[in-house]
């Protein structure tokens, strides 16, 4: 029985596990969507949520704590500038895990961990791009799909 057993070992020693999770957290924050195995996604979900909560604090101490975990300064900047404002009104539940089925090579159960609302941001950017293309085509007097 697994009573009172917390956390995921992920078949690694402590240092390798910590490095793996730090890399996953950094990638989720930078790319807003990562495909990995289900146990890794479950292990990284609370860490990503904790980082976003830390980003909402926006103090020097919070920035230094985030820099301890995240690998790149760009991810720290994105966390505090972009994600903290996006999730300002939300209290937790910043990530979702979507199961994708077994991986072809080894049959491992694969999942996608993504930030909630990231699909809306990407969709809005795509809509703005298409609208700009339509307006430019209308100004030039041609159909939107035609090449110049």
Regions found by a protein language model. Name each.
Residues 1-19, 23-148:
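Structured, basic alpha/beta domains of bacterial-type, RNA-associated proteins
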């Amino acid at each position: 029985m697994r009573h009172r057993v917390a956390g995921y070992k992920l078949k690694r020693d402590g240092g390798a596990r910590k490095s793996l999770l730090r890399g996953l957290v950094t990638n989720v924050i930078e790319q807003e969507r990562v495909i990995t195995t289900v146990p890794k996604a479950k292990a990284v979900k609370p860490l990503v949520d904790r980082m976003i909560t830390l980003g909402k604090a926006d103090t020097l101490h919070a920035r230094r704590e985030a820099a301890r975990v995240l690998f790149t300064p760009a991810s720290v900047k994105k966390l505090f500038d972009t994600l903290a404002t996006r999730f300002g009104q939300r209290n937790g539940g910043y990530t979702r895990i979507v199961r994708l089925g077994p991986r072809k090579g080894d049959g491992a159960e694969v999942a996608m961990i993504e930030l909630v609302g990231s699909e809306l941001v990407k969709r809005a950017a795509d809509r703005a791009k298409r609208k700009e293309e339509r307006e430019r085509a209308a100004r030039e007097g041609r159909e939107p799909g035609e090449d110049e």
